Regions:
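Amphipathic alpha-helical repeat scaffolds
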Residues: 22, 42-46
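N-terminal "domain-start" segment that seeds a small globular fold
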Residues: 7-31, 51, 116
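Thiol-/selenol-based redox modules, centered on thioredoxin-like
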Residues: 116-119, 123-172
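Proline/glycine-enriched tight loop/beta-turn segments at coil->beta junctions
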Residues: 33-38
Length: 172
């Protein structure tokens, strides 16, 4: 089952305006994350950075009770490193890394078919933060409790880096 991924009309320029399809085909409403810090990360199962799933899961397990959420978005945009179906992806993530953080349906994060959420994340005219581009799998967008982008983290930076952990725990 395929759900249309959409954005609600909103003047708040935040990720809270988005509803997307999760990896099981259910609606995931970002407005339910108001008051939580969020890491949005594009993922791939056949990438040299796939090992980051382990650190993402550890980070999620450690901080999920501290108003922190990780949202994974599988993408096949970089050297076709996420070729599988949603079913293949979640099976891989659960069996190999014990992933329990929310995973969304596979999307496009660059180019003319870029998903509306990633249009928001990468365009200053929409996010009021800065223009950016997704450079590779496992790029991280750190979103504050108001749904605004605060930091964009390189794909090569480990999810459990001091920079990210400090951001999560700041203000706790």
């Amino acid at each position: 089952m395929s759900l249309t991924l959409s954005a609600q009309t909103s003047v708040d320029n935040s990720v809270h305006q988005f509803k997307v399809a999760d990896i099981y085909g259910n609606i995931f409403d970002f407005s339910k994350l108001k008051g939580k810090k969020i890491m949005i990360v594009n993922t791939a199962s056949k990438c040299g950075l796939t090992y980051q799933y382990e650190a993402l899961q550890e980070l999620y397990s450690q901080y999920k009770d501290f108003n922190f959420m990780i949202i994974g978005f599988p993408s096949n945009d970089f050297l076709w490193q996420e070729p599988g179906s949603n079913e293949d992806i979640i099976e891989f993530c659960e069996e190999n890394y014990g992933v329990t953080f929310p995973m969304m349906s596979k999307i496009t994060v660059k180019g003319s078919k870029k998903h509306p959420l990633y249009q928001f994340l990468t365009q200053k005219s929409k996010n009021k933060f800065k223009d950016s581009r997704v450079t590779w799998n496992f790029q991280k967008y750190l979103i504050n409790k108001d749904g605004k982008i605060e930091k964009i983290i390189s794909p090569r930076t480990r999810p459990d880096s001091q920079e990210i952990v400090s951001w999560i725990t700041d203000g706790q």
